[in-house]
Amino acid sequence: MALCATTQRTIRIAATLRRVARPFATDAVVESDYKRGEIGKVSGIPEEHLSRKVIIYSPARTATQSGSGKLGKWKINFVSTLKWENPLMGWTSTGDPYANVGDSALAFDSEEAAKSFAERHGWDYKVKKPNTPLLKVKSYSDNFKWKGNPQPEN
């Protein structure tokens, strides 16, 4: 079975691209040992934000969802310091540029990845371990089983 000219040309172009692109992909991976806080100094972050305190935690399962899509993720939240009540509207205001960053932006696949990110930026961190509830395996019919005679109250 012969392939049409367009398909043959596409296969040749794909093979050429694989040969050309492979060296660049391996060169892009650079392993480097960073000292604590080194990335923060190079990135242009102001000095007062280099010594921030953060909390690393694994968020609980959403009460309204039964799926496992967001389970196992770790997040970083900044400890907020500068808050005041806006006198006009009564809203809570902040002068902290990182006040709402952790809610959506800083998510990691593992606790170690979150720790290394915080260390590279020079942030002091505290890890909150996830609270896993103990679940009893039982069926609906267990609600109606005979549990013996009632015990007298003392």
Swiss-Prot record:
UniProt KW Transport keyword: yes
Cellular component terms, GO, for this chain's entry? mitochondrial inner membrane; mitochondrion; plastid
What InterPro entries does its record include?
NADH_UbQ_FeS_4_mit-like, NDUFS4-like_sf
Q: Which UniProt keywords apply?
A: Electron transport, Membrane, Mitochondrion, Mitochondrion inner membrane, Respiratory chain, Transit peptide, Transport
| A matching Pfam family | NDUS4
Q: What is its main location?
A: mitochondrion
Q: Does the keyword Chloroplast apply?
A: no
* Superkingdom assignment: Eukaryota
Provide the induction entry.
Answer: By cold.
- Give the location in the cell: Mitochondrion inner membrane
List GO BP terms, alphabetically.
cold acclimation; electron transport chain; response to osmotic stress
Question: Which effects follow disruption of this gene?
Answer: Leaves have a reduced capacity for cold acclimation, appear water-soaked, leak electrolytes, and accumulate reactive oxygen species constitutively. Sugar-sensitive germination, delayed growth, modified respiration pathway, and altered stress responses.
From the record, give the cysteines joined by S-S bonds: none
Cited function: Accessory subunit of the mitochondrial membrane respiratory chain NADH dehydrogenase (Complex I), that is believed not to be involved in catalysis. Complex I functions in the transfer of electrons from NADH to the respiratory chain. The immediate electron acceptor for the enzyme is believed to be ubiquinone.
**What family does this belong to?**
Belongs to the complex I NDUFS4 subunit family.
The record's subunit annotation is: Complex I is composed of at least 49 different subunits. This is a component of the iron-sulfur (IP) fragment of the enzyme.
Q: What is this protein called?
A: NADH dehydrogenase [ubiquinone] iron-sulfur protein 4, mitochondrial
Which organism does this record belong to? Arabidopsis thaliana
Q: Quote the gene name from the UniProt entry.
A: FRO1
